Amino acid sequence: MAKNGEGLLMSAIMMVVAAALIDREGRVLVQRRPVGKMMAGLWEFPGGKIEHGETPESALVRELDEELGITVDIARLAPAAFASEPLAGRHMLLLLYICRSWEGSPRALDAEELMWCTPDSLRALDMPPADRPLIGLLEAVLSSRGA
């Protein structure tokens, strides 16, 4: 851990991106984390870590291809919300983007399963702590934009 200018300990920040893929019916795609991974069985927005040299948007395009087999144009990603959460000795900063247009049909390439659900039904799902605050923020953004 590093110290900031005031001598306080700071943990390393892990930057993570995720997508709220919204279909024509206004449903959101979530995926269930596979067995063998941290937080296995929990539902999450698809995405992943930003690798060295990547922008958040290019990382998300890569992750959506790797995890779902879909192609997304960076111009179709709209920043929506973020969450901040301590995780395994680090601090995760999760950036959520809304995406309403992509090429291909999402497939569970890295997840146990996929599910389309309405934004209000997300609250009933078991989700990682960092994803939970994004639900209300996502609902607010979608309602202000007319879903």
Model-derived segments and their meaning:
Residues 4-28, 49, 82:
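Conserved N-terminal beta-strand and adjoining loop/helix that marks the start
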Residues 23, 81-105, 115:
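Active-site-adjacent beta-strand/loop module that shapes the phosphate/pyrophosphate-binding cleft
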Residues 27-66:
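Conserved Nudix-box catalytic region and its N-terminal flanking loop in Nudix hydrolases
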Residues 71-81:
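A short coil-to-beta-strand element that immediately follows conserved catalytic motifs
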Residues 96-98, 107-138:
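NUDIX/MutT-family hydrolases
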Residues 139-147:
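Generic C-terminal helix-cap and adjacent flexible tail
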